[in-house]
Structures are given as C-alpha cells and as structure tokens.
C-alpha cells in the first residue's frame, strides 16, 4: 500500500478530530485511523468529493470524499456566496430546499436551509420528502433565485447527493455552474455558517402540493378518454420514495378511480429493503408491482424512482405476459400520443416544438417532422431540455421532451424530468388505447408500423482507476483519428464530433449548431443506424448507444425484427472491438 498516500490521508483525517466536528464523526474517523487496514481511511480521505456541474454525489460517511453534513455545509456556503454575489442589490433573496427518502436526506436538507438562512437568504424548506419535479416547480412558483435538492436519484442505498438549481427551476448551466464550483472550492470548514437565522426559514408543503397537482393536470390531453376508461386498472409503486406523496393523488385528480399501490413499497425507507437497487431500469425492481398486477389483472404497472423524476412502464404482450418498456419506447409513446392527439383535437397551432437528447431514438424526430412539429436535439442531461424551453418562452410552445434514460417532461411548468406528469399521461394513453381496443403494447406496434421499426441498445464498458481513465481517453482519441468506415455491414455516411462541433458527410465538413462542445462522437450509416459514444461523466465507463432500423411488416413480426436487430448490434459491437 502507498505509504505516502496513507500519510497524506492520515494528516487530512486528523483535522476531522477537531471540535469543529461532532462526536459521532470524530469516532468514525478515529476508528479508520486506528484500523490496521487503511483501505477505508484512504477511500474516505484521498480526495475531496468533487462539486461538479450537477452538484455532489457520493457514498455517505465521514471524510472529505464522502457525503456528510460538513461536505454539504461547505458546498452550501459556496453556493450561498455565489447567490449573494449574483443577486447583489436584490432585497429579498430566496431558495427552495427539498429532499428525497434517503438516509440522512432530512438532516442534509435542514443543514442546507440553516446555512442559507445564516447567509441572509430565505430558505423555503419542504416539510418532508417531495419529488424532484415539485422542487423545480416550487422555485418558479415562489420566484426563488435558486434551489437545492438532496437526492441521489436511483443510485444504491449507500449514496446521497446534492443538486443545485437556478431561478428558472432547471439545474444550473454556464456560466453559473463553473461560478458556483469556483466559490465552493474556496470554502474551508471554519468559514461555514451553521447557526441558522430561524426567521429566514419557512416550511412549505400542502399548499405547494395543490399548486403542483394543478400544474400537472395541464399535461392532460383529452379528459373524455379518461372519463370513458376511469376504471383502467393501474398498479403503481414509488419504490420506497417520494412518488408516494404526489402520484396516487395526481392520478385521482385526472379522474382515474382504480389505482392500486404496492403497499410494501409505499413505506418510505432509505434502505430500499424490497429491491436490490431502486432503479426502475432494472426489471428486478418491478417484480412486486408485476405480481400485484397479475393478481388484479391490471392494465399496466408503473413505478417511479426514489426522487420521482424517472419512471418505468410495464404492459401486457399478446400472450398476456408482462413486457417492460425501455426508456426509448416510453419516450416514443408519450411523444406520439401528444402530437397525434393534440393534432386531432385541433390543439396544434403551428408554433410547437419537442426536444430529445442526441442519444434518444430518431423515430421521435420522424413523428414530429411528419406532423409539422419542430424537433430539437440536445446533449444528455435534462438541463439542456430546460434551456430550450427557456430560450423560446413566450414565443414557441414546448409540448414534450425526453431522453432514453427513462425521463420525460410533457409540459412546461417544470424544468426537470417529471414522473408524476408522465405517469398520469401514460395512464391516459393506456385509457385511449383501451378505448380503441388496444393495449399499450399494441399501440407501440402501431407506432412501429406507421413510422418504422427501430431497436436500441446501450452498452457500457467499465474501465476502473487511473489506467481505465487513460484507456477511455485513448479510445476516444483513436475513434477521432481513424473513425470506422463501416459498421454492421453498412458504410458510415456521416460523422458528428461534438468536441469540435463539426459534421463530416459526403466529404463535406459543416458546423454543428450546439451551445457548447461535448466529448461525444456519432456515426450514421447508410441503412439508418446511429451509434453514439461518450465517456460517462459520473462513472469510470465509456458508453455506446446503438439504434438500428429494421423491417417489420406486421405486429406479429416484432420478435423476429428484434432478433434481426440484435444480430446487427452484435456485428457493430464486433466492428468496434467491444
């Protein structure tokens, strides 16, 4: 073991034995210092938990590389310093503070509110856990200058996090993101103002819930459909998280009457005892919901992740078996329904637009373009979708947007992923499908037949440690130096490099119109395949997103079309050396 590293970590840890830290923290640090095995000490102190463009995220515990009230305190002091500078001269500066169901989330949220108040900033603190989208909504509703949400979204139970929001209700973008980071990095623990000014802390809750529920209702497209199918059998699980506060109530306000919750998962619990991981992308997390759905002969099963920004949807296939939709399919169905039915109801005025991330299915673009709705591509991360809404506020009408990672926003009153609104709208879609003699699965097949079949596959390659980071960097450099000329048996006809913002097609180089650069490459082939590659911003991984087009002549052909598409994906993986 590196003795120099042990010495460095020991010196850093000994600072945490001072009276500035509570007895529990000191005891935890002392145990690490006294242990023969220094692995825990090194993990906790070898670096500072980085405050990045999205805030903080890390394992909870004592140490500089952990989520704890002291690291949260320094982050908040830096954020408060930046807010006071950015809004210098403004009389009443305020922030909204919310949190999810995780262990220590309430403690961290109260710490955040205390520090803001101590810095002369009014803190609207939610009375208890609330969904991420409601926190985004509250920032706008209260005219606050910023917000903080304590959440680690769908990460494992050991984690917690800190998301920073700006006055538009979206996560911070340039120049504020780097400005906040600079301020946070200047702060030492002795500069943190932990003593609250209780006059500047206001608890919020029930009234904001009502306002948010009223806003979510604006995402509804056709009330008549729900009125005819109000007994649609819905099963819902919040996976022990914040969705329990809002989503059953939201479904009732939309007019649904047969709402069944997974009782074991309605219990708020940061240990997530009924799932391996509280991630709705994992089929295992849906097991209890599907069991209840089978018992009730439900039409669909839905779940939200712990902070209720993302969702999962399960519907029945022609054999009556449960079929879990992927994030692309969910976004596709929502986009299709919004456009098709707003058009039928005469709700499209010609100034509408939709937004999708560059790695999300191109079929959404096909649907939008065919129906004269503008479609925009943005980078991954919902803050970029929020940016597009803000750019055209009051000029053009945002009607929906999403990403392949199970996040969607079907209205413009919120500026982050919104599972309450998306779940309500998916139930409306299921009601509309049932009204027309279809299931959600049948509707998906109809979309494929009308707009073309496409299959998506996301591949993550893990490369841990510094050597792994170097390898990922080299892979991206190699792809840029010698891009593939063919993939899956089809020639590459277009290359997009978002690091240089240049597109090469037919030997011609043109500019890509994006607000900033990003380390992403895309290859498009003659047969309609799209491959996107980017290093993960939060994990030691390089990610490949593959979308292949295929032939599907009838709904019964879906399994064979999928099998053929998987073969093509395997060929592409081989071509890329994966």
Say what each PLM segment does.
Residues 45-65, 152-155, 234, 238-250, ...:
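Conserved phosphate/anionic-ligand binding catalytic regions in large, soluble enzymes, centered on
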Residues 165-193, 328-351, 356-366, 419:
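Glycine-rich phosphate-binding loop plus the immediately following alpha-helix
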Residues 96-159, 257-313:
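N-terminal small/polar loop signature for handling phosphorylated ligands or for N-terminal nucleophile
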Residues 108-116, 159-166, 309-329, 364:
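Short Gly/Thr/Asp-enriched flexible loops that form oxyanion-binding sites at enzyme active sites
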Residues 16, 20, 24, 40-44, ...:
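Gly/Ser/Thr-enriched, mixed-charge loops and adjacent short helices
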Residues 294, 298-300, 321-323, 341-534, ...:
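Phosphate-binding and adjacent anionic-ligand microenvironments
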């Amino acid at each position: 073991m590196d003795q120099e590293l042990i010495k460095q970590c020991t010196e850093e840890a000994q600072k945490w034995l001072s009276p500035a830290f509570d007895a529990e923290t000191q005891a935890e640090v002392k145990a690490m210092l006294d242990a023969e095995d220094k692995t825990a000490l090194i993990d906790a102190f070898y670096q500072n938990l980085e405050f990045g463009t999205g805030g903080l995220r890390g394992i909870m515990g004592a140490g500089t590389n952990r989520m704890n009230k002291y690291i949260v305190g320094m982050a908040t002091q830096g954020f408060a310093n930046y807010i006071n500078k950015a809004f210098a001269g403004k009389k009443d500066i305020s922030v909204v503070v919310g949190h999810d169901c995780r262990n220590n989330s309430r403690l961290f949220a109260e710490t955040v509110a205390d520090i803001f108040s101590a810095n002369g900033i009014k803190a609207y603190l939610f009375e208890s856990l609330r969904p991420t989208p409601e926190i985004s909504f509250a920032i706008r509703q209260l005219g606050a200058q910023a917000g903080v949400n304590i959440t680690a979204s769908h990460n494992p139970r050991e984690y917690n996090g800190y998301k920073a929001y700006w006055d538009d209700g979206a996560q911070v973008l340039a120049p504020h993101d780097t400005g906040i980071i600079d301020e946070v990095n200047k702060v030492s623990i002795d500069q943190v103002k932990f003593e609250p000014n209780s006059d500047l802390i206001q608890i919020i809750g029930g009234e904001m819930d009502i306002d948010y529920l009223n806003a979510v209702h604006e995402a509804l497209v056709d009330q008549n459909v729900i009125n005819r199918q109000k007994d649609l059998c819905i099963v819902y699980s919040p996976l022990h998280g914040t969705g329990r506060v809002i989503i059953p109530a939201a479904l009732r306000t939309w007019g649904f009457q047969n709402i069944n919750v997974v009782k074991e998962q309605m219990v708020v619990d940061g240990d997530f005892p009924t799932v391996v991981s509280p991630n709705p992308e994992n089929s295992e997390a849906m097991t209890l919901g599907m069991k209840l759905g089978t018992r009730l002969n439900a039409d669909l099963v839905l779940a939200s992740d712990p902070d209720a920004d993302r969702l999962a949807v399960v519907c029945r296939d022609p054999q009556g078996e449960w079929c879990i939709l992927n994030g692309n399919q969910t976004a596709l169905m929502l986009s299709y329904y919004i456009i098709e039915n707003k058009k039928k109801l005469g709700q499209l005025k010609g100034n509408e637009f939709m937004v999708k991330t560059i790695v999300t299915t191109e079929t959404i673009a096909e649907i939008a373009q065919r129906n004269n709705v503008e479609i925009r591509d943005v980078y991954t991360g919902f803050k970029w979708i929020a940016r597009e809404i803000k750019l055209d506020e009051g000029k053009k009408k945002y009607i929906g947007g999403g990403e392949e990672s199970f996040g969607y926003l079907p209205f413009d009153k919120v500026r982050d992923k919104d599972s309450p609104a998306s779940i309500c709208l998916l139930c409306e879609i299921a009601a509309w499908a049932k009204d027309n003699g279809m299931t959600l699965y049948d509707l998906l097949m109809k979309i494929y037949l009308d707009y073309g079949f496409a299959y998506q596959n996301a591949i993550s390659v893990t490369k841990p440690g510094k050597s792994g980071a170097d390898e990922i960097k080299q892979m991206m450099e190699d792809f840029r130096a010698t891009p593939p000329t063919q993939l899956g048996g089809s020639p590459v006809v277009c290359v997009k490099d978002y690091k240089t913002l240049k597109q090469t097609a037919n030997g011609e180089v043109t500019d890509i119109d994006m607000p900033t650069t990003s380390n992403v490459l895309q290859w498009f082939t003659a047969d309609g395949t799209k491959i996107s590659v980017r290093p993960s911003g939060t994990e030691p991984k390089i990610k490949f997103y593959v979308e292949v087009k295929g032939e599907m002549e009838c709904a019964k052909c879906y399994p064979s079309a999928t099998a053929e598409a998987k073969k093509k994906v395997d060929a592409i993986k081989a071509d890329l050396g994966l």
